[in-house]
Amino acid sequence: MKFFAVLALCIVGAIAHPLTSDEAALVKSSWAQVKHNEVDILYTVFKAYPDIQARFPQFAGKDLDTIKTSGQFATHATRIVSFLSELIALSGSESNLSAIYGLISKMGTDHKNRGITQTQFNKFRTALVSYISSNVAWGDNVAAAWTHALDNVYTAVFQIVTA
C-alpha cells in the first residue's frame, strides 16, 4: 500500500508544473484544429511506426490503407483522440490536477499491463507532434506549449510504466 501512495505522490509531483494559461490556450487552440481527424492521426502513427500497429491484435499484420476505412479503426482512433481531448480540456488549471492524474494513472497502468514500452510511447509522441505540427500554424510558442504538456504527461506515465 505504501508503494502506491509513494507512486501517487511521484505522479502528482510530475504533473505539478501545469501549463500556464497561455500554454494551455495554445495547446487547446491547436488541438481544436485537428481533434476531429481521429483516423488520420492514428493512421499517421501506424504509418510512421508499424511496430505500434503490430501491438494491436485487431490491426496486426493487416494492410494499413485497408483498415484505415474500417469502423474498428475509426472506433479505436476516436478512443485515443478522446483521451487526449479530455486531458487537454483539463489543462491549464491547477484545480484539475487530480483529474488529470486519474486519467494518466489509468492509461499508464493499462498500457503497462499490455507491455507498452517507453520507446513505443515516445514513438507515438513523435508521430502525434509531427501530425499536429503539419496541420496547424506551428511556431516556437506552440511547440514549447506542446513540449511542456507532453513532458508532463510522459513523465507521469513513465513513472507508472517503469514501476
Curated annotation (Swiss-Prot):
It holds the Pfam family Globin. Keywords: Heme, Iron, Metal-binding, Oxygen transport, Signal, Transport. The keyword Metal-binding applies. Heme b binds at H76, H111. CDD domains: Mb-like. Residues 1-16 form the signal peptide. Residues 18-162 form the Globin domain. GO terms for molecular function: heme binding; metal ion binding; oxygen binding; oxygen carrier activity. It comes from the Eukaryota. Gene3D superfamilies: Globins. GO terms for cellular component: extracellular region; hemoglobin complex. There are at least 12 different components in Midge globin. Belongs to the globin family. This is Globin CTT-Z. It comes from Chironomus thummi thummi. The gene is CTT-Z.
